């Protein structure tokens, strides 16, 4: 289970975010990006000591400042179910051709497009012809 897939599933659900400086933010996840920057709505911020509280309509948190996230168990269960169905990353997949290329066997002996192959079949030295020697006429 990948953290970003977990966050994508957790959109519009409540969560708690603790920052590296000790502050905590409780709110509903609006969106997140690949760097784990997140937007929350209906946020309650708690100071490091736990003695001060602020209510904010919305909040943006940079991903690199996050220490941990607390997400409801039902979200984690939803992600596990999706992964079991094969929709998540790395689940059971059917063999299918992907991307570009020659379509046949992938890497292997002399089947690809790279270097190597049958010796002497490339653009190397020309073959010596019998009967003539270089330098004598």
Swiss-Prot record:
Q: Which GO molecular function entries does the Swiss-Prot or TrEMBL record give?
A: RNA binding
Question: Which keywords does this chain's UniProt record carry?
Answer: Acetylation, mRNA processing, mRNA splicing, Nucleus, Ribonucleoprotein, RNA-binding, Spliceosome
Tissue specificity as recorded in UniProt: Ubiquitous.
Q: Which SUPFAM superfamilies match?
A: Sm-like ribonucleoproteins
Question: What biological-process terms (Gene Ontology) are attached?
Answer: mRNA splicing, via spliceosome; nuclear-transcribed mRNA catabolic process
The family database entries (CDD domains) matched by this protein are listed as:
LSm4
State its location(s).
Nucleus
Q: Gene Ontology terms, cellular component aspect? A: cytoplasm; nucleoplasm; nucleus; spliceosomal complex; U2-type precatalytic spliceosome; U4/U6 x U5 tri-snRNP complex
Every copy of the Sm domain together lies at 2-75
Output compositional bias ranges, type Gly residues: 100-123
Keyword Acetylation present in the record's keywords: the answer is: yes
Where N-acetylmethionine occurs along the chain? 1
Which family is it part of? Belongs to the snRNP Sm proteins family.
**Briefly, what is this protein's role?**
Plays a role in pre-mRNA splicing as component of the U4/U6-U5 tri-snRNP complex that is involved in spliceosome assembly, and as component of the precatalytic spliceosome (spliceosome B complex). The heptameric LSM2-8 complex binds specifically to the 3'-terminal U-tract of U6 snRNA.
Q: How does it assemble?
A: Component of the precatalytic spliceosome (spliceosome B complex). Component of the U4/U6-U5 tri-snRNP complex, a building block of the precatalytic spliceosome (spliceosome B complex). The U4/U6-U5 tri-snRNP complex is composed of the U4, U6 and U5 snRNAs and at least PRPF3, PRPF4, PRPF6, PRPF8, PRPF31, SNRNP200, TXNL4A, SNRNP40, SNRPB, SNRPD1, SNRPD2, SNRPD3, SNRPE, SNRPF, SNRPG, DDX23, CD2BP2, PPIH, SNU13, EFTUD2, SART1 and USP39, plus LSM2, LSM3, LSM4, LSM5, LSM6, LSM7 and LSM8.
Q: Can you name this protein?
A: U6 snRNA-associated Sm-like protein LSm4
Biological source species: Mus musculus (Mouse)
């Amino acid at each position: 289970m990948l953290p970003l897939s977990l966050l994508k599933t957790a959109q519009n659900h409540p969560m708690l975010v603790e920052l590296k400086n000790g502050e905590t933010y409780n709110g509903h996840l609006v969106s997140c990006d690949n760097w784990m920057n997140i937007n929350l709505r209906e946020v309650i911020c708690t100071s490091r000591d736990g003695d001060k509280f602020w209510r904010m309509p919305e909040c943006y948190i940079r991903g690199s400042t996050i220490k941990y996230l607390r997400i409801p168990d039902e979200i984690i269960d939803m992600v596990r179910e999706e992964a079991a169905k094969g929709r998540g990353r790395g689940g059971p997949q059917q063999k299918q051709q992907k991307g570009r290329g020659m379509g046949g066997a992938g890497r292997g002996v002399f089947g690809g497009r790279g270097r190597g192959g049958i010796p002497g079949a490339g653009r190397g030295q020309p073959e010596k012809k019998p009967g003539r020697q270089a330098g004598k006429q």
